[in-house]
From Swiss-Prot:
Result when mutating D8A: Able to bind to the agr promoter, but fails to repress spa expression or to activate RNAII transcription
Function per UniProt: Global regulator with both positive and negative effects that controls the expression of several virulence factors and the biofilm formation process in a cell density-dependent manner. Required for transcription of primary transcripts RNAII and RNAIII generated by agr (virulence accessory gene regulator) locus. Negatively regulates the expression of spa (protein A) and aur (metalloprotease aureolysin).
Main location: cytoplasm
Gene: sarA
Biological process terms in GO annotation: response to stress
Listed GO CC annotations: cytoplasm
Subcellular location: Cytoplasm
Keyword Repressor: yes
GO molecular function: DNA binding; DNA-binding transcription factor activity; metal ion binding
Consequence of substituting K21A: Able to bind to the spa promoter. Able to repress spa and aur expression
SUPFAM superfamilies per UniProt: Winged helix' DNA-binding domain
Result of changing D88A: Able to bind to the spa promoter. Fails to repress spa and aur expression
Species name: Staphylococcus aureus (strain MW2)
Annotated consequence of substituting Y18A: Reduced binding to the spa promoter. Able to repress spa and aur expression
Protein name (record): Transcriptional regulator SarA
Length: 124
Protein backbone atom coordinates (compact mmCIF):
# COMPACT_ATOMS: atom_id res chain seq x y z
CA UNK A 1 0.00 0.00 0.00
CA UNK A 2 1.53 3.30 -1.09
CA UNK A 3 1.21 6.18 1.31
CA UNK A 4 1.51 9.71 0.00
CA UNK A 5 3.79 11.98 2.01
CA UNK A 6 2.13 15.10 3.38
CA UNK A 7 4.02 18.26 2.50
CA UNK A 8 2.42 20.95 4.63
CA UNK A 9 -0.20 21.77 7.26
CA UNK A 10 -2.88 22.39 4.62
CA UNK A 11 -2.46 18.92 3.13
CA UNK A 12 -2.43 17.41 6.62
CA UNK A 13 -5.70 19.10 7.56
CA UNK A 14 -7.27 18.11 4.25
CA UNK A 15 -6.23 14.45 4.62
CA UNK A 16 -7.34 14.21 8.26
CA UNK A 17 -10.71 15.80 7.44
CA UNK A 18 -11.20 13.41 4.53
CA UNK A 19 -10.20 10.39 6.65
CA UNK A 20 -12.62 11.50 9.39
CA UNK A 21 -15.45 11.66 6.84
CA UNK A 22 -14.66 8.13 5.67
CA UNK A 23 -14.41 6.84 9.27
CA UNK A 24 -17.81 8.37 9.99
CA UNK A 25 -19.29 6.82 6.86
CA UNK A 26 -17.96 3.36 7.79
CA UNK A 27 -19.33 3.59 11.33
CA UNK A 28 -22.74 4.85 10.20
CA UNK A 29 -23.35 2.61 7.19
CA UNK A 30 -21.71 -0.63 8.35
CA UNK A 31 -22.34 -0.37 12.12
CA UNK A 32 -18.73 -1.05 13.06
CA UNK A 33 -16.25 1.12 14.89
CA UNK A 34 -13.07 2.14 13.14
CA UNK A 35 -11.11 -0.04 15.57
CA UNK A 36 -13.22 -3.04 14.52
CA UNK A 37 -12.64 -2.10 10.89
CA UNK A 38 -8.89 -1.90 11.54
CA UNK A 39 -8.82 -5.36 13.16
CA UNK A 40 -10.74 -6.91 10.25
CA UNK A 41 -8.49 -5.18 7.72
CA UNK A 42 -5.39 -6.49 9.52
CA UNK A 43 -6.81 -10.03 9.46
CA UNK A 44 -7.72 -9.72 5.79
CA UNK A 45 -4.29 -8.38 4.87
CA UNK A 46 -2.41 -11.11 6.78
CA UNK A 47 -3.85 -14.41 5.61
CA UNK A 48 -3.34 -16.70 8.61
CA UNK A 49 -5.57 -19.19 10.41
CA UNK A 50 -4.60 -17.83 13.80
CA UNK A 51 -3.34 -14.52 15.12
CA UNK A 52 -1.97 -13.40 18.45
CA UNK A 53 -3.98 -10.54 19.91
CA UNK A 54 -0.69 -8.99 21.05
CA UNK A 55 0.54 -8.83 17.42
CA UNK A 56 -2.66 -7.12 16.28
CA UNK A 57 -2.38 -4.58 19.11
CA UNK A 58 1.27 -3.89 18.24
CA UNK A 59 0.48 -3.43 14.55
CA UNK A 60 -2.48 -1.08 14.97
CA UNK A 61 -2.05 2.41 16.33
CA UNK A 62 -4.67 2.03 19.07
CA UNK A 63 -4.45 1.51 22.81
CA UNK A 64 -4.83 -2.07 24.07
CA UNK A 65 -8.30 -1.58 25.64
CA UNK A 66 -9.69 -0.27 22.34
CA UNK A 67 -8.44 -3.30 20.41
CA UNK A 68 -9.54 -5.75 23.11
CA UNK A 69 -13.06 -4.25 23.02
CA UNK A 70 -13.15 -4.42 19.20
CA UNK A 71 -11.99 -8.05 19.25
CA UNK A 72 -14.64 -8.96 21.84
CA UNK A 73 -17.42 -7.40 19.74
CA UNK A 74 -16.20 -8.96 16.48
CA UNK A 75 -15.92 -12.36 18.15
CA UNK A 76 -19.50 -12.06 19.43
CA UNK A 77 -20.59 -11.23 15.86
CA UNK A 78 -18.82 -14.40 14.61
CA UNK A 79 -16.18 -12.70 12.48
CA UNK A 80 -13.68 -15.00 14.23
CA UNK A 81 -13.23 -17.09 17.37
CA UNK A 82 -11.13 -16.00 20.30
CA UNK A 83 -9.56 -18.30 22.86
CA UNK A 84 -6.78 -18.44 25.41
CA UNK A 85 -3.59 -20.31 24.59
CA UNK A 86 -3.63 -23.70 26.33
CA UNK A 87 0.01 -23.34 27.42
CA UNK A 88 -0.11 -19.68 28.45
CA UNK A 89 -3.43 -18.32 29.71
CA UNK A 90 -2.17 -14.73 29.25
CA UNK A 91 -2.00 -15.19 25.48
CA UNK A 92 -5.18 -14.63 23.45
CA UNK A 93 -5.50 -16.26 20.04
CA UNK A 94 -7.79 -15.14 17.23
CA UNK A 95 -8.88 -18.06 15.03
CA UNK A 96 -10.42 -17.55 11.59
CA UNK A 97 -12.09 -20.37 9.67
CA UNK A 98 -13.00 -20.29 5.96
CA UNK A 99 -16.60 -19.20 6.55
CA UNK A 100 -15.54 -16.39 8.86
CA UNK A 101 -12.85 -15.23 6.42
CA UNK A 102 -15.52 -15.09 3.72
CA UNK A 103 -17.70 -12.94 6.01
CA UNK A 104 -14.76 -10.58 6.65
CA UNK A 105 -13.90 -10.32 2.95
CA UNK A 106 -17.54 -9.68 2.07
CA UNK A 107 -17.80 -6.80 4.54
CA UNK A 108 -14.50 -5.26 3.43
CA UNK A 109 -15.54 -5.58 -0.21
CA UNK A 110 -18.73 -3.64 0.55
CA UNK A 111 -16.71 -1.03 2.45
CA UNK A 112 -14.29 -0.68 -0.49
CA UNK A 113 -17.20 -0.22 -2.88
CA UNK A 114 -18.67 2.46 -0.62
CA UNK A 115 -15.31 4.25 -0.35
CA UNK A 116 -15.12 4.34 -4.15
CA UNK A 117 -18.61 5.83 -4.27
CA UNK A 118 -17.69 8.34 -1.55
CA UNK A 119 -14.66 9.44 -3.55
CA UNK A 120 -17.08 10.63 -6.22
CA UNK A 121 -19.36 12.34 -3.68
CA UNK A 122 -16.86 14.05 -1.38
CA UNK A 123 -15.09 17.10 -2.68
CA UNK A 124 -11.35 16.50 -2.32
Amino acid sequence: MAITKINDCFELLSMVTYADKLKSLIKKEFSISFEEFAVLTYISENKEKEYYLKDIINHLNYKQPQVVKAVKILSQEDYFDKKRNEHDERTVLILVNAQQRKKIESLLSRVNKRITEANNEIEL
